[in-house]
Amino acid sequence: MGWIRGRRSRHSWEMSEFHNYNLDLKKSDFSTRWQKQRCPVVKSKCRENASPFFFCCFIAVAMGIRFIIMVTIWSAVFLNSLFNQEVQIPLTESYCGPCPKNWICYKNNCYQFFDESKNWYESQASCMSQNASLLKVYSKEDQDLLKLVKSYHWMGLVHIPTNGSWQWEDGSILSPNLLTIIEMQKGDCALYASSFKGYIENCSTPNTYICMQRTV
């Protein structure tokens, strides 16, 4: 009887252990199956969430590239128009009067810039043939457009060796502080350049010239 009771007791213990082990296996199997079932769901949700996200990223990148291209194009157009725009000569309300065709009318004076190169005497003759004279600078205020001139042009200013003065074609003396005379080389004639500067030049040297006609 003791032996049978011992076997029953051991059997009960084994059954208990088996039952516990079986429960552990079931729990482990359930956990594994739950994870396997959960993973596809999670992956599916990830894919569902990732697809709109990457689509949005793609749209954002495309719009960014398009914006950069548009900015580049507009910048190029703006710079091109900026560097190619013509210099506008300011106009005043003062009466200018009639000028020859294609001449510039500004503050009661008519101006023409000639691109052909002539010596001083030939330039003077060309202006006289058009009822005008070589440029005479008499006022920085009334002739402020001359600040726009960038190259050298003959003007009607000559040096008088006998008294060392500079005179205009009409015989008037150059007013002090009106022009800065710069000796570029030996000569008795003067070229006009920018910022009210006069450059001494040999009268026989070919240069472009400016003709001027008073309207009053």
Swiss-Prot record:
InterPro entries registered for this protein in UniProt: C-type_lectin-like, C-type_lectin-like/link_sf, CTDL_fold, NKG2D, NKR-like_CTLD
Record-linked PANTHER family: NKG2-D TYPE II INTEGRAL MEMBRANE PROTEIN (PTHR47494:SF1)
Primary localization class, coarse: membrane
GO BP annotation list: adaptive immune response; cell differentiation; cellular response to lipopolysaccharide; defense response to Gram-positive bacterium; natural killer cell activation; natural killer cell mediated cytotoxicity; negative regulation of GTPase activity; negative regulation of natural killer cell chemotaxis
Induction: Up-regulated by interleukin IL15 in primary NK cells.
GO molecular function, one term: signaling receptor activity
GO cellular component term of the entry, any: cell surface
C-type lectin domain ranges (all copies): 98-213
Keywords, comma-separated and alphabetical: Adaptive immunity, Cell membrane, Differentiation, Disulfide bond, Glycoprotein, Immunity, Innate immunity, Lectin, Membrane, Receptor, Signal-anchor, Transmembrane, Transmembrane helix
Residues in compartment: Cytoplasmic: 1-51
CDD domains (UniProt xref): CLECT_NK_receptors_like
TM stretches of this protein: 52-72
Positions glycosylated per UniProt: 131, 163, 202
Extracellular topology ranges: 73-216
Pfam families: Lectin_C
Entry's localization field: Cell membrane
Misc. remarks from the entry: Is not capable of signal transduction by itself, but operates through the adapter protein HCST. Some families of ligands for human and mouse KLRK1 receptors have been characterized being very similar in structure and highly likely to be orthologs. In humans, an additional distinct subfamily of ligands (MICA and MICB) differs structurally, having an extra MHC alpha 3-like domain.
Protein known as: NKG2-D type II integral membrane protein
Described purpose of this protein according to its UniProt entry: Functions as an activating and costimulatory receptor involved in immunosurveillance upon binding to various cellular stress-inducible ligands displayed at the surface of autologous tumor cells and virus-infected cells. Provides both stimulatory and costimulatory innate immune responses on activated killer (NK) cells, leading to cytotoxic activity. Acts as a costimulatory receptor for T-cell receptor (TCR) in CD8(+) T-cell-mediated adaptive immune responses by amplifying T-cell activation. Stimulates perforin-mediated elimination of ligand-expressing tumor cells.
Organ and tissue specificity: Expressed in natural killer (NK) cells, CD8(+) alpha-beta and gamma-delta T-cells. Expressed on essentially all CD56+CD3- NK cells from freshly isolated PBMC. Expressed in interferon-producing killer dendritic cells (IKDCs).
Membrane topology, from the record: Single-pass type II membrane protein
Oligomer status and interactors: Homodimer; disulfide-linked. Heterohexamer composed of two subunits of KLRK1 and four subunits of HCST/DAP10. Interacts (via transmembrane domain) with HCST/DAP10 (via transmembrane domain); the interaction is required for KLRK1 NK cell surface and induces NK cell-mediated cytotoxicity. Does not interact with TYROBP. Interacts with CEACAM1; recruits PTPN6 that dephosphorylates VAV1.
